[in-house]
């Protein structure tokens, strides 16, 4: 019973989606067609009014800023270089001895098992069955 419900639900949901898309697409295209067919009303243009002239402002003389005297850069006294302390030396660590690589013995290849052949099974025919 549950298999039939899930099978019918899996077939029904794409069908419903296709129907909804078909129903929603029709009014949009009809509305767009109506917009193209309706003539737009003409709006009358208003006459252009002459622009009043703006009065010109009198020109003011540019103010010159007084020049400031140049101030010499103060010379900084040189600081003596501070010697960095030497780092203590550590004795070298002895090198670790190198170990030879271990060779694993090769395992002999095992022969692949042959597939067992299963004899073909034929259904016996019973009297009265097609």
From Swiss-Prot:
Localisation: Secreted, Cell wall
Segment forming the signal sequence: 1-32
Chain spans, region Disordered: 71-130
13 X 5 AA tandem repeat of P-[DEGQ]-[AEFLIV]-[QPT]-K, as annotated region: 47-125
Sequence repeats: 47-51, 52-56, 58-62, 63-67, 69-73, 74-78, 80-84, 91-95, 97-101, 102-106, 108-112, 113-117, 121-125
GO CC terms: extracellular region
Biased composition (Basic and acidic residues): 71-84, 98-117
Keywords: Cell wall, Repeat, Secreted, Signal
Source organism, top-level taxon: Eukaryota
Protein name: Protein PELPK2
Biological source species: Arabidopsis thaliana
Gene name, Swiss-Prot/TrEMBL: PELPK2
């Amino acid at each position: 019973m549950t298999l039939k419900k899930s099978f019918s639900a899996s077939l029904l949901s794409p069908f419903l989606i296709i129907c909804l898309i078909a129903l929603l697409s029709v009014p949009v295209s009809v509305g767009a067609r109506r917009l193209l067919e309706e003539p737009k009303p003409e709006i009358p243009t208003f006459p252009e009014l002459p622009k009043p002239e703006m009065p010109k402002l009198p020109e003011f003389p540019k103010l010159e800023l007084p020049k400031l005297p140049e101030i010499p850069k103060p010379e900084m006294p040189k600081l003596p270089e501070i010697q960095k302390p030497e780092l203590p030396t550590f004795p070298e660590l002895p090198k670790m001895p190198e170990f030879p690589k271990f060779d694993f013995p090769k395992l002999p290849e095992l022969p692949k098992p042959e597939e067992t052949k299963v004899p073909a099974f034929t259904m016996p025919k019973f009297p009265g069955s097609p």
